[in-house]
Every structure is written in structure tokens, then in C-alpha cells.
């Protein structure tokens, strides 16, 4: 029986990466732009109903909600070739259509006002599922709608569907460029608090690293949003292949996440992918072997999160867990040999307090998508260096907060009324504690860390109840 997953796309960024994700899924399952199965798509063996369901006229509809507070991106989707793919009852655009003005507090407040309409859609999708496993939220943490409204929805989902898994694909802003969103550090910090407390797994998509990969690996001098979004959709579709082309293991979300997240707070994952899709435009075909793919996945230049660590700190960072999803014609003995070579060469630095092993899931490739490479791989990794990304967010927040800059934008909303800025302070404390915990993971004594904090035990018990298969 399939374990269905409902995708919720919030804000401009969430809907753009969501759109690319559905295009990719349609290609891989032989589904046309109108949702009808292509004539050649007869081979089967895939599970379409994890992400799609069939209407009475047999066309496939994504289990997806498209939500935004301003109409531009969703209008673009409704006027695109894929306009007949979605269920139009699952599209929500705010009546006044003014957006959230890149303000977290505005997005959160508007989320409170329209939550009943949105949860009606969620409930309808959930009721249409035989065995709902959880939700996937696509959003960005820097703007207003994806961050603020996304935060409110995370809290509500956690409250109403407490036994269901919530995974997010969260886009972090480009830290190397000056942002046009001056309050980005505030928005990011407030969203990070909810991602820490209300999500079971966060796949971090770091725009800094995505841009770097597009420039260095794909030789694009000035990558567009569409090009970085296609990298994101590659990662999203690859991370769900074992759910859609099931094997003996890792064929549901719980199975995927259980080995990656040993402790409840440290649930932020980084990704790596090879060989990259757009590389084919550079007319470069190379021999791909399992060892080659697995070795490349461990190279920092292929990891889609920038480490802001200094050299000494970087050398102390360790992997908590790794899952490699290998697609293509692969013999399990090749996997075994590759793991042995990686171990012999000491290519991976694991933590001392848990089993040090790379998990490998083998998955079939879609028969409908032609690729020039025989083997491709996605790495999902829990790595302690991610704390430097959060440290960077904290540093930028502190700079703004010291100057009391732009706080009036937030004081207009109920949560920050009467100059009550405790929400900022609480968010900062939670993220500082998260950074400390990831740092503590590097030490062999981590198991004793945080024992004096009774709150930790409650969070752990909550996640454990969801991870009971």
C-alpha cells in the first residue's frame, strides 16, 4: 500500500521550485503536461500514487497545494503548458493579492487569518489518501510569504497532524551577494526557530552553494533562477526515487529519515548530486562507476551547502550519517567494494558515538528519461559543518539587531505589538542551542550533552512516536 505524501508550496520561491519538481516527476513517470499518461508509458513498476492521484477521467493530479499571498507566480503556472495538471481547488491566492512585503511578521499574521481555508484544502487531500505518511513543504526562509506563512503552516500541521512526518525543502539566501531584502536576517532567524521545533527533517538548499555549483561545475557565467531551480528539482526528484520506484528498503519516508536523524534537533540535511544534469550541455560524457559517483559525492565542491568554517574548524567537522541513493544499472557487489575502498582511504570522518557507515539505497532509473550516464547518485548527509551556516545567519541578525534597524516593520503586527521583541530573543536562543548541539556532536561525549535539559526529552519522545513504523 502506498504511503502518500502531500506537497505544500508556499510563496514565490516555493511555487517555482515546486513547479520544476512536478515537471520532473511528470517526465519520469511518463505523464503528459495535461496529466494524461503518454502512450509509451506502459512499463509500469513505478508508484505514481505516492505523489499523484487519478481523477475520474483517468488523468493524474499532483497531491499538491499552491499557496501565495500575491498572484504573479501562480498566474504564471496557471497560464503555462501545465495549467491543466493541477487541481484548481488546491490553489490559494490571497484576495487582496498584496503579498507579504518580504516581512515575516506580515506573512505569519496573514497565515493566521486564512489558515481555515488552507487547512480545509489540506484536510480534503488527507481524506483522499489511503495511508497518508506526511507532508513536504517547499519554501524560502528569507522573504515574507515562504518564511512567515510557511512558519505558521508548520506550526498548524504539527498541531493537527502530530503523528505525520513533516519534511521541508528550505531555500537559504545567497550570503555572498547583498540582498534586496534588507530584513532577510530577521526573517531567516524567525523561520529557523520553526524549522527546528516543528519539522522532522529539513533539506537545506543553500543559494550560495547552488550558484557556486552552477558557475564552477556547469560553467554558467551568470546562472538564472530557472537554472538553479532545475538543480533543486533534480535533488528533490532524486531524493524521492526510492519512494516512487520502490525496492526492499527505504521505500517510505520514515525508512529514509530514520537512519539519517539519530537525534531530534539535528535534523538538517545537506545534499550532493553527481553527475549534474546541465553538464550534458557541455558535451562531456564520462564513464560513471559506483565508486566514482560515491567518491565525488563526498567532495565538498559537489555539496549543495556552503561551509563557512575556517580551515581548523572544517577539519573537526564530522558526518553524523550519510545516505547515498544510487540510480542506474548497479551490481550490489560494486557497492560493497566501493564502500570498502572509501573506508580504506579514510575519505569520510564520522562521529565517534554512533555506527560509522554510509547507507546505500539502490534505485531504478525512469525508463522514460534518457540520460548519457549509466550511474548517478544523490547524497543526503547530516554533517556538523552545517552549524556554520546557522552561525552566519545569527551573525547577520546580530548586526541588524544591534542597530535596532527596521524593527518598526515588525512592530505593526500583533506578535511584536507594544515593542515586545521577545520572539526574536527566543528564536536566537533556540538557534544558538542548535549550533551548540551540532558542535557537541563532534565530541565523543555527546551522548551526555543536554541531559540537564528536560525539554530535550520531550522533543525526542515526540519524534520517536512519528518514527514508529
Swiss-Prot record:
GO terms for biological process: cytoplasmic microtubule organization; meiotic spindle organization; microtubule nucleation; mitotic cell cycle; mitotic sister chromatid segregation; mitotic spindle organization. Signal peptide: none annotated. Keywords: Cytoplasm, Cytoskeleton, GTP-binding, Microtubule, Nucleotide-binding. SMART domains: Tubulin (SM00864), Tubulin_C (SM00865). It comes from the Eukaryota. Tubulin is the major constituent of microtubules. The gamma chain is found at microtubule organizing centers (MTOC) such as the spindle poles, suggesting that it is involved in the minus-end nucleation of microtubule assembly. PANTHER family: TUBULIN (PTHR11588). Belongs to the tubulin family. This is Tubulin gamma-2 chain. It comes from Zea mays. The gene is TUBG2.
Amino acid at each position: 500500500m502506498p504511503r502518500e505524501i502531500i506537497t505544500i508550496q508556499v510563496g514565490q520561491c516555493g511555487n517555482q521550485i515546486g513547479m520544476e519538481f512536478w515537471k520532473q516527476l511528470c517526465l519520469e513517470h511518463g505523464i503528459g503536461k495535461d496529466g494524461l499518461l503518454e502512450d509509451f508509458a506502459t512499463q509500469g513498476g513505478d508508484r505514481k500514487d505516492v505523489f499523484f492521484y487519478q481523477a475520474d477521467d483517468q488523468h493524474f493530479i499532483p497531491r499538491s497545494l499552491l499557496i501565495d499571498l500575491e498572484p504573479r507566480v501562480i498566474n504564471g503556472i496557471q497560464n503555462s503548458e501545465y495549467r491543466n495538471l493541477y487541481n484548481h481547488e488546491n490553489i490559494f491566492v490571497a484576495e487582496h493579492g498584496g503579498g507579504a512585503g518580504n516581512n515575516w511578521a506580515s506573512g505569519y499574521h496573514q497565515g493566521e487569518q486564512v489558515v481555515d481555508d488552507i487547512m480545509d484544502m489540506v484536510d480534503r487531500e488527507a481524506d483522499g489518501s489511503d495511508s497518508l505518511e506526511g507532508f513536504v513543504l517547499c519554501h524560502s526562509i528569507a522573504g515574507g510569504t515562504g518564511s512567515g506563512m510557511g512558519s505558521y503552516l508548520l506550526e498548524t500541521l504539527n498541531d493537527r497532524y502530530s503523528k505525520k512526518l513533516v519534511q521541508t525543502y528550505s531555500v537559504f539566501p545567497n550570503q555572498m551577494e547583498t540582498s534586496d531584502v534588507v530584513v532577510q536576517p530577521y526573517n531567516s532567524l524567525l523561520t529557523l526557530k520553526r524549522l527546528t521545533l516543528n519539522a522532522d527533517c529539513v533539506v537545506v538548499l543553500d543559494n550560495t552553494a547552488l550558484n557556486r555549483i552552477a558557475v564552477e561545475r556547469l560553467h554558467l557565467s551568470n546562472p538564472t533562477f530557472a537554472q538553479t531551480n532545475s538543480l533543486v528539482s533534480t535533488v528533490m526528484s532524486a531524493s524521492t526515487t526510492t519512494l516512487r520506484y520502490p525496492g526492499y528498503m527505504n521505500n517510505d519516508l520514515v525508512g529514509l529519515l530514520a537512519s539519517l536523524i539519530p537525534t531530534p534537533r539535528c535534523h538538517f540535511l545537506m545534499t550532493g548530486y553527481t553527475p549534474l544534469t546541465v553538464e550534458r550541455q557541455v558535451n562531456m560524457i564520462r564513464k560513471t562507476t559506483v565508486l566514482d559517483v560515491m567518491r565525488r559525492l563526498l567532495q565538498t565542491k559537489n555539496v549543495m551547502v556552503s561551509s563557512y568554517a575556517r580551515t581548523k574548524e572544517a577539519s573537526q567537522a564530522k558526518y553524523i550519517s550519510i545516505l547515498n541513493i544510487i540510480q542506474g544499472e548497479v551490481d550490489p557487489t560494486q557497492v560493497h567494494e566501493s564502500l570498502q575502498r572509501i573506508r580504506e582511504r579514510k575519505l569520510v570522518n564520522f562521529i565517534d558515538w554512533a555506527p560509522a557507515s554510509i547507507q546505500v539505497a539502490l534505485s531504478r532509473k525512469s525508463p522514460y528519461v534518457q540520460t548519457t550516464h549509466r550511474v548517478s547518485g544523490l547524497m543526503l548527509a547530516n554533517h556538523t559543518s552545517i552549524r556554520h551556516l546557522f552561525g552566519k545567519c545569527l551573525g547577520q541578525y546580530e548586526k541588524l539587531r544591534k542597530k535596532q534597524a527596521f524593527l518598526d516593520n515588525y512592530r505593526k503586527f500583533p506578535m511584536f505589538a507594544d515593542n515586545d521583541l521577545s520572539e526574536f530573543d527566543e528564536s536566537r536562543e533556540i538557534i544558538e542551542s542548535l549550533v551548540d548541539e551540532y558542535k557537541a556532536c563532534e565530541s565523543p561525549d555527546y551522548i551526555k550533552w543536554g541531559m540537564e535539559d528536560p525539554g530535550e526529552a520531550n522533543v525526542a519522545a515526540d519524534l520517536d512516536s512519528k518514527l514508529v513504523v
